[in-house]
Swiss-Prot record:
This is Histidine ammonia-lyase. InterPro entries: Aromatic_Lyase (IPR001106), Fumarase/histidase_N (IPR024083), HutH (IPR005921), L-Aspartase-like (IPR008948), Phe/His_NH3-lyase_AS (IPR022313). GO terms for molecular function: histidine ammonia-lyase activity. Contains an active site 4-methylidene-imidazol-5-one (MIO), which is formed autocatalytically by cyclization and dehydration of residues Ala-Ser-Gly. Transmembrane segments: none annotated.
Length: 513
């Protein structure tokens, strides 16, 4: 049976977002939501017919909120809003981000507080399920009043305007609708505002980054465990009784992950008089990785709330009361997504330091730059440079976006979140850190193959090593390889969900204890 996810505004999970955004799983509006949507719409229709003054329904927008709009102009008002607010810049957002945006907006609207017609929500749903993906520029949102510019670009194809991708081809909005067999719509009162006023874009990008960060945290533990195998790491820093007296959840989880991954390894060792303890990047794995785990667990808890929230303005209450408030403001997610970027940056930063330990012959006791006949061959020399470059870039990107604000709209919107910038930065940091962790795994596998003794790996590290070596070659010397290709293969391996799934079939990995 084909899987279909019901959207009721209450129960969407981050895993559902991934299934719909990346795996093309279909979704539908849950029957339980229909009554609330229709009731909310009736209230808006009554507002227009009674000529009541309500922001965004019978008034202008932003600082023009005191300009009254006649009932006969309320429809034109909404189309004008979309045409003028679609003012984004930059490259288009990737397909998975666009699909996540459409999904989260639908899920918010079906809660029945936005006054939008059911048929209009169903039109956006039809675009999503039929694979019509609006062209949404990545830049241009202040994260308050919501993600106005990018969401306006999302709406354009619904009106037969703008641009959209269909089956990989960029078309005009109308062409995309025609090829998909979808009719365009006209907006009714308040509907333009209901579609574009909210934190949907920053939440969608941040949700994808958060999910990927959780996978990266597990991969970083694996990378660290492989480095421990290379360096004959001392295992006492991972003993449970050390961590139970400082019961930070992420720290406990990391120590357990390392123990599970290294179970049965013949490469690890115990402290001796000549070697009392390992350096921080190995010994303090639970404390460093664990801190990022705790941060990202917090961010996920915020994402879980936001993807099931109403972030529109004004809000149409069940009793007919209309509230002009600030649920569109991105600050509740801007700060967590800045936190997310910092947490991921630390993972890339410490992984790069372990790459340096692997390629440094004085620290690894292996050939310089992990290649036979160093000098004639350079091996992993510049690979470490590249990782250092990415780690340094991450440190710049990790500067919080949410500490900035530039007033807008004639100072009516005088304090904004910059939350969309925070989410986009976090995703860029994630991509950089993932490349670094992939390189650490590649370098550790190379180092293991260069070790003079060939001892049994741990229960989890052996599974990872065997899978990795099926795709990424040992580098004998420089002459017959292009290391760039091998680095790309390494990244492709760890980005394939089946790699981590196979390791987790062998050993349990988690981010919280």
């Amino acid at each position: 049976m084909t899987r279909v996810i019901n959207l009721d505004g209450e129960s969407l999970t981050i895993e559902d977002v991934i299934a719909i955004a990346r795996q093309g799983v279909a979704c539908r509006i849950d029957d339980s939501a229909i009554e609330a949507v229709n009731a909310s719409r009736k209230i808006v229709d009554d507002i227009v017919s009674e000529k009541r003054v309500v922001y965004g329904v019978t008034t202008g927008f932003g600082s023009l909120c005191n300009v009254s709009i006649s009932p006969e102009d309320t429809v034109q008002l909404q189309e004008n809003l979309i045409r003028t607010h679609a003012s984004g810049f930059g490259d288009p957002l990737p397909e998975d981000a666009v699909r996540a945006i459409m999904l989260i907006r639908i899920n918010s609207l079906v809660k029945g507080y936005s006054g939008i017609r059911l048929s209009t929500i169903e039109k956006l749903l039809e675009l999503l399920n039929k694979g019509v993906h609006p062209y949404i520029p990545e830049k241009g949102s202040l994260g308050a009043s919501g993600d106005l510019a990018p969401l306006a670009h999302m709406v354009l194809p619904m009106l037969g305007l703008g641009k959209a991708y269909y089956k990989g081809e960029l078309l005009s909005g109308q062409e995309a609708l025609d090829k998909a067999g979808i009719d365009k719509i006209s907006l009714a009162a308040k509907e333009g505002l209901a579609l574009i006023n909210g934190t949907t874009v920053l939440t969608a990008i941040g949700a994808l980054a958060t999910y990927d960060a959780i996978q990266l945290l597990k991969l970083s533990d694996l990378a660290g465990a492989l480095s421990l195998e290379v360096h004959n790491g001392i295992t006492s820093p991972f003993e449970e009784n050390l961590h139970t007296i400082r019961p930070q959840s992420g720290q406990l989880a990391t120590a357990r992950n390392i123990r599970n991954l290294l179970e049965g390894s013949q490469n690890t060792t115990v402290a001796t008089q000549s070697r009392v303890q390992d350096p921080y990047t190995l010994r303090c794995l639970p404390q460093i990785h664990g801190a990022s785990k705790d941060s990202i667990a917090y961010v996920k808890s915020k994402v879980d709330i936001e993807i099931n929230s109403v972030t529109d303005n004004p809000i149409i209450c069940k009793d007919g009361h209309v509230i002009s408030g600030g649920n569109f403001h991105g600050e509740p997610m801007a700060q967590p997504f800045d936190f997310l970027g910092i947490a991921i940056s630390e993972i890339g930063n410490v992984s790069e330091r372990r790459v340096e330990r692997l390629v440094n012959s004085q620290l690894s006791k292996l050939p310089s730059f992990l290649v036979k006949y160093p000098g004639l061959n350079s091996g992993f020399m510049i690979t470490q440079y590249a990782c250092a470059s990415l780690a340094s870039e991450n440190k710049v990107l990790a500067h919080p976006a949410s500490v900035d604000s530039i007033p807008s709209c004639e100072n009516q919107e005088d304090f904004v979140s910059m939350g969309t910038t925070a989410a986009r930065k976090a995703f860029e940091i994630l991509k950089n850190s993932r490349r670094i962790v992939a390189t650490e795994i590649m370098a550790a596998c190379q180092a293991l193959d260069l070790k003079p003794e060939n001892h049994e790996l741990g229960k989890g590290t052996k599974v990872a090593y065997d899978l990795f070596r099926k795709e990424v070659n040992f580098i004998e010397h420089d002459k017959h390889i292009e290391i760039y290709d091998e680095l790309n293969k390494a990244s492709a391996v760890i980005e394939d969900p089946s790699f981590l799934e196979a390791v987790e079939q062998a050993v349990e990995l988690s981010i919280q204890f």
